[in-house]
Amino acid sequence: MAFDGTWKIDRNENYEKFMEAMGIGMMKRKLGAHDNLKLTIQQNGDKFNVKEASNFRNIEIEFTLGVTFEYSLADGTELSGAWTLEGNKLVATFTRKDNGKVLKAIREIVGDELVQTYIYEGVESKRFFKR
């Protein structure tokens, strides 16, 4: 599938404002903006394996489209939610366990980039990855 491959962060748009809305402190926001995130995505039907490697952690996540699973952000925020495929976009709706607020994430291929959009409390951010 189009998402398969290894993607390295190239640039961010409004990412620090997004992290601020999420309640992440200034020091972690500054570090998070330069995390050197690399995603390795493999899709097999409706199952995905995503490896996240950054300056802060290396984790592997497996999920099935439409099936709720638990996930922790790099800052420790715990979420519960599911990814779905809407056209050519991977769309996730996660609920924070600490306050019940919704975090939406969208992954889509635009040209030769993987664009990951986050929406939380009206703040939208984009992260752009290149193969």
Predicted feature locations:
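Hydrophobic small-molecule pocket/channel-lining residues, especially in calycin-type beta-barrels
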Residues: 1-131
